[in-house]
Amino acid sequence: MKVLTFGEIMLRLKAPGHERFFQSPMLEATFGGGEANVAVSLANYGMDAEFLTVLPKNDIAECCIRELRYFGVDTKKIVRGEGRMGIYYLEGGANQLPSKVVYDRAYSSIALAKPGDIDWDKAFEGVDWFHITGITPAISESAMELSLESVKEAKKRNITVSCDLNYRKNLWKYGKKASEVMRELAKYVDVAIANEEDVQKSLEITVDVNVESGELDREKYRALGNKVLESYPNMKCIAITLRESHSADWNGWAACLNDGKDFYVSKKYEIRDIIDRVGGGDSFAGGLIYGLNHYEDKQSALEFAVAASCLKHSIPGDFNRVTVSDVTKLMGGDGTGRVQR
């Protein structure tokens, strides 16, 4: 099973610890991006994972590629082009002070990329599963057109397509609403991943559910999933993540999955003293792709995804540096955090 993920990887510049921007004269530099984060998770689980993007021809991009290779992600299909590397700045939240992200992605290499820039015959060679998110079509009109081209080309080759809807209100700035684009892209998706806001903003599908209440109304979330699957008969299933934010460093975390026949709900984790929640959704997506391809039942696949994402909240950086063994131990109830000897 070979998985190809496609999107933008950025230079991540984070204020140290819980400091505000430039409270001290330094920023911690790493790399991250939704689709790359998924590829790293899959490589950590032993899957054949490839990452496709467009990067400039400079030393920072080379460092980024080397970082992906360190985790075992295949980078041979990365295209080099004009433009620059996107950047995002991060402040880590605590208690009632939320985390903050500032994007600097204009004129990045992938934002400038357009249909025809990628040879899809080469890109999809040997690929069984293709993963994309709603972030890439948000960054520019040409990236949106390239994203639509990618899923259409994937389906021409009978490749399974997963999409994390990932609505980002601060990125949709080129004149189109997210729903105008994502409702078209969703026609080519087999496995959808979202939260309630993603479904509402990206697909304009709503059900009266209240995540903040801390209670999962099974029938309402089942109805939300049913509405999506009825609107998009091409979809085989949709997974909806459920985050209850008590504060910036204390979240409840669970998910449900609807395949049109059965409705599955995961265990709920109370995650206190969060180290870094950025990449938590991507670690769920990576866990779900792994789970759907390694477990015979969808309940186990869902539990693997939620447990993997739970662990990511305790790891600094975008990447989920855990193994299958780490995840299955938590699935099995070993969440004490005791020293492993």
Model regions: which residues?
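Acidic-glycine-rich active-site phosphate/pyrophosphate-binding loop
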Residues: 5-19, 251-267
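Conserved N-terminal subdomain of the carbohydrate kinase-like
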Residues: 48-135, 327-341
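Conserved phosphate/ATP/ADP-binding segment of small-molecule kinases
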Residues: 171-261
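Short beta-strand/loop segments at the ligand-binding rim of alpha/beta enzyme cores
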Residues: 158-165, 171
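Hydrophobic beta-strand scaffold residues
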Residues: 49, 75, 161-162, 193
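Glycine-rich phosphate/adenosyl-contacting loop at the front of the ribokinase-like
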Residues: 1-73, 94-96, 113-115, 273-275, ...
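A short helix->loop->beta-strand "cap" motif at the edges of active sites that frequently abuts
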Residues: 153-160, 232-236
